[in-house]
Design a protein with these regions (language model features):
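Nucleic-acid-binding surface
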Residues: 8, 22-24, 51-201
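Short amphipathic alpha-helical interaction segments
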Residues: 27-40
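Short amphipathic alpha-helical interface segments
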Residues: 2-18
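A short, conserved structural fragment
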Residues: 42-49
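Short acidic, hydrophobic short linear motifs in intrinsically disordered regions
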Residues: 15-28
Length: 201
């Protein structure tokens, strides 16, 4: 027996951990009108343009910002928390985007996000995918890239958070100093890194 459009849609949402985009629905042959109808019936909740979720679903900020800024990468203090280098849960999230990326729509509706702009040559250095604390895949910078970002942006970052992150990394067993050094060379940060590594190693 063939599934109805509604059943097909709900099946896809369950596979997607409780969310679906308009694009994904259209790819299944499900028109926007069906999404609208289910929203009116309160079987779905519209999170933002193009993103829907089950009413019971907890839409976390990591998911929201990842959807609104698909090319954004969680970085700095946010990456440090996600990587276990900081115990300070972010109240304001930090994302890195390429110079020229338009994030004005998100900035106009959310005041808990900081965007850092980077040259495209540095954008992919250390980019990885991890599972967020809420169980969904998100883009984030690895520990080594995060250390360099923190050093570069030291004047903006809370001194206690900065100190915790730097000390946690250099005292940790998972540090990769070769990778850190390679990143520093690529990002022209050898001298800045040396100031900290010589003291902490």
């Amino acid at each position: 027996m063939q599934m109805s459009k509604r059943e097909l849609l709900l099946k896809k949402i369950k596979e997607n951990n409780g969310i679906i985009t308009t694009k994904e629905a259209l790819n299944l042959g499900i028109h926007k009108d069906i999404l609208k109808e289910l929203t009116i019936k309160e079987e779905l909740e519209k999170i933002t343009n193009g993103l829907y979720a089950l009413p019971s679903e907890n839409i976390d900020e990591y998911l929201y910002f990842s959807y609104r800024i698909p090319k954004g990468i969680f970085s700095h203090e946010t990456a440090a928390y996600l990587q276990g280098l900081s115990t300070r849960m972010p109240l304001v999230y930090v994302m890195t985007v390429k110079v020229g990326d338009n994030v004005s729509r998100v900035k106009s509706v959310r005041d808990n996000i900081i965007f850092k702009y980077i040259k495209k040559d540095y954008y992919d250095i250390g980019k990885i995918t991890i599972t967020s604390p809420f169980g969904r895949e998100i883009s984030v910078y690895d520990k080594e890239r995060t250390i360099l970002d923190m050093i570069k942006d030291k004047d903006r970052i809370d001194s206690q958070v900065f100190s915790e992150v730097i000390k946690s990394y250099f005292a940790g067993k998972e540090k990769n100093l070769l990778k850190l050094s390679k990143y520093a060379i690529k990002m022209n940060m050898e001298y800045a890194l040396k100031q900290y590594s010589e003291v902490l190693l």
